[in-house]
Amino acid sequence: MTNIRKSHPLMKIVNNAFIDLPAPPNISSWWNFGSLLGVCLILQILTGLFLAMHYTSDTTTAFSSVTHICRDVNYGWIIRYMHANGASMFFICLYMHVGRGLYYGSYTFLETWNIGVILLITVMATAFMGYVLPWGQMSFWGATVITNLLSAIPYIGTNLVEWIWGGFSVDKATLTRFFAFHFILPFIIAAIAMVHLLFLHETGSNNPTGVSSDVDKIPFHPYYTIKDTLGALLLILALMLLVLFAPDLLGDPDNYTPANPLNTPPHIKPEWYFLFAYAILRSIPNKLGGVLALAFSILILILIPLLHTSKQRSMMFRPLSQCLFWTLVADLLTLTWIGGQPVEHPYTTIGQLASIMYFLLILVLMPTAGTVENKLLKW
């Protein structure tokens, strides 16, 4: 008799994806972030569902409903803070996952990589809309500033912004539609993630060496199920430490003030995970130029496979490229810091230099390093 997990139509899919899947024997902890992103997504959908049961998407009651969740709903405070800080964990895992892909050359799996970029953009859009929902000062002004960027698009810009707002300013219509989109998008993300996984399983996982591991595979279960479970436990531990000891560490105090269209906060800034892109946007004095730079700072990921010049896939044995990779990481941290600072000297200059460096590293220096390394190895 055939094992049910190999014969049942549904179980067969699960079996081929999570149990009998042939996996490289040498993938490190950097390969844990894919499953951790899955854990984050499930956690966000569950906590979000319970929050949606008590939340009202009306400008007059949205702020009060969030306060009500924290004060009157049983364990509402923990659900709210798990959801808010869960987003931060989500982005930490996302950036680590993308960084791993860049370092080890996983972007040569073109379909998987491009679906991943689409996922990244969708998650960013979802997080942005979620930040608007509590209807605090930073929610309102963040929504106003970011949606207003679209008005830089020639000819159709103003109409586009008013169409997104559903009126002449960020108001009730905007909040309602943002809530609707914020609710539906995680399920769309889950569906796209399935496609991401489907394309990955067409080729099999990459590994730290960047060399094909077809000659030597091990089953996913029990080796990587155990490893992923440990990763998930550590992730939940980190999240709960944040939620229970410093729930507001990554938030903005301005969001505890109800939204007021007549009073602008002194420093409008997004959540920490968008600060690098916000710094790039602010570093260009021209509105349209800033918007294009902002868009390109994320969309540049699509070009990465085209910019790969090395004859080796991974950076594991490429010290020159490694130096540039970690310079890029430092540059992104610098941009994140600058994005949270006021627009004044010396921050503006540092931001402009870091922005130039960001594009220079990806578009010029890293491809050049790949070519130089080929020459050094006489390839």
Swiss-Prot record:
Heme 1 (or BL or b562) is low-potential and absorbs at about 562 nm, and heme 2 (or BH or b566) is high-potential and absorbs at about 566 nm. It is found in: Mitochondrion inner membrane. The keyword Ribosomal protein does not apply. GO terms for cellular component: mitochondrial inner membrane; respiratory chain complex III. The cytochrome bc1 complex contains 11 subunits: 3 respiratory subunits (MT-CYB, CYC1 and UQCRFS1), 2 core proteins (UQCRC1 and UQCRC2) and 6 low-molecular weight proteins (UQCRH/QCR6, UQCRB/QCR7, UQCRQ/QCR8, UQCR10/QCR9, UQCR11/QCR10 and a cleavage product of UQCRFS1). This cytochrome bc1 complex then forms a dimer. SUPFAM superfamilies: a domain/subunit of cytochrome bc1 complex (Ubiquinol-cytochrome c reductase) (SSF81648), Transmembrane di-heme cytochromes (SSF81342). Binds 2 heme b groups non-covalently. Belongs to the cytochrome b family. The chain crosses the membrane at residues 33-53, 77-98, 113-133, 178-198, 226-246, 288-308, 320-340, 347-367. GO terms for molecular function: metal ion binding; ubiquinol-cytochrome-c reductase activity. It is a multi-pass membrane protein. Component of the ubiquinol-cytochrome c reductase complex (complex III or cytochrome b-c1 complex) that is part of the mitochondrial respiratory chain. The b-c1 complex mediates electron transfer from ubiquinol to cytochrome c. Contributes to the generation of a proton gradient across the mitochondrial membrane that is then used for ATP synthesis. GO terms for biological process: mitochondrial electron transport, ubiquinol to cytochrome c. This is Cytochrome b. InterPro entries: Cyt_b/b6_C, Cyt_b/b6_C_sf, Cyt_b/b6_N, Cytb/b6-like_sf, Cytochrome_b, Cytochrome_b_C_euk/bac, Cytochrome_b_N_euk/bac, Di-haem_cyt_TM. Heme b b566 binds at H97, H196. A ubiquinone binds at H201. Heme b b562 binds at H83, H182. Its cofactor is heme b. Keywords: Electron transport, Heme, Iron, Membrane, Metal-binding, Mitochondrion, Mitochondrion inner membrane, Respiratory chain, Transmembrane, Transmembrane helix, Transport, Ubiquinone. Gene3D superfamilies: Cytochrome Bc1 Complex, Chain C (1.20.810.10).
